[in-house]
């Protein structure tokens, strides 16, 4: 791993611009702090974008898809062929994220990193690393070479996004079994017990959750030597799409593009990214707090302040996309409101 590009520092925050944005917020015609998180969001974006007038109009949504060998252990409520079927749905416009992308005027980048059955689908970028990952209860989910290729795939999507002037990047995922993989990665990175982070995923009942937990515990025992190591945990227990998301978040920070993180699986990728390169944390916004029980713990670990709490558990980047209108409105409020002086409104006495 001589070319460890992910260790390159993130772009620096423009502190003077952030301070100028904070000063502007204090002059707008409202009680100081009354717009709460929206104010903080606008100030944060000003510092990250280095702009007096922050914006989130140019939106890129990348959906990374891959299958998981651990599905053979019965950890998902859905059959594996759904992953490939959903690729059709994404590009045909019928998926939730497809609808949201249209409504938000976003560029949708759908990437097949390794579904079980190869497909020649127009509108899908085929960067196949393998026919799904290996079953991580028998050995590593990925080889090092496959893991590095998946990281690079995420980075490549960000570079494509940067080339068209993207202001906000969303990563989404599709892969039956990927909540099991994400839970296993997070448990390994955080060195915590599986029941803390294992949940129903796409709809397991209580018995299914118990079984899924036991499968993950077997995998954690097998790969115990890598506990606490973010990269090895990712490669041994993760999926192609989780690794691609990790690479995307790292690249966003390095290229100066703000990323909006989606739900549980994306937050696990964000956790790995931050553990690999702590400087990338400033460039991550968090769209929502999802229904998966472990998501709350991850958000607390990442000291994240999600914008929405709607009980979502879909994935695909959908929760992050739903938060985009709030980001855009935060920018519009910051940019468009009058100051007390401009509106000839009396400010609160000092």
Swiss-Prot record:
UniProt-annotated catalytic positions: 316 (proton acceptor)
Alphabetic keyword roster: Cobalamin biosynthesis, Glycosyltransferase, Transferase
Disulfide-bond pairs as recorded: none
Any one Gene Ontology BP term: cobalamin biosynthetic process
GO molecular function terms noted in the UniProt entry: nicotinate-nucleotide-dimethylbenzimidazole phosphoribosyltransferase activity
Assigned EC number: 2.4.2.21
Catalytic activity: 5,6-dimethylbenzimidazole + nicotinate beta-D-ribonucleotide = alpha-ribazole 5'-phosphate + nicotinate + H(+)
InterPro entries: Nict_dMeBzImd_PRibTrfase, Nict_dMeBzImd_PRibTrfase_bact, Nict_dMeBzImd_PRibTrfase_N, Nict_dMeBzImd_PRibTrfase_sf
Pathway per the UniProt entry: Nucleoside biosynthesis; alpha-ribazole biosynthesis; alpha-ribazole from 5,6-dimethylbenzimidazole: step 1/2
Family, similarity comment: Belongs to the CobT family.
NCBIfam families assigned to the protein according to its UniProt record, in alphabetical order: cobT_DBIPRT, PRK00105.1
Function description: Catalyzes the synthesis of alpha-ribazole-5'-phosphate from nicotinate mononucleotide (NAMN) and 5,6-dimethylbenzimidazole (DMB).
Protein name according to UniProt: Nicotinate-nucleotide--dimethylbenzimidazole phosphoribosyltransferase
Lineage: Bacteria, Pseudomonadati, Pseudomonadota, Gammaproteobacteria, Pseudomonadales
Gene for this chain: cobT
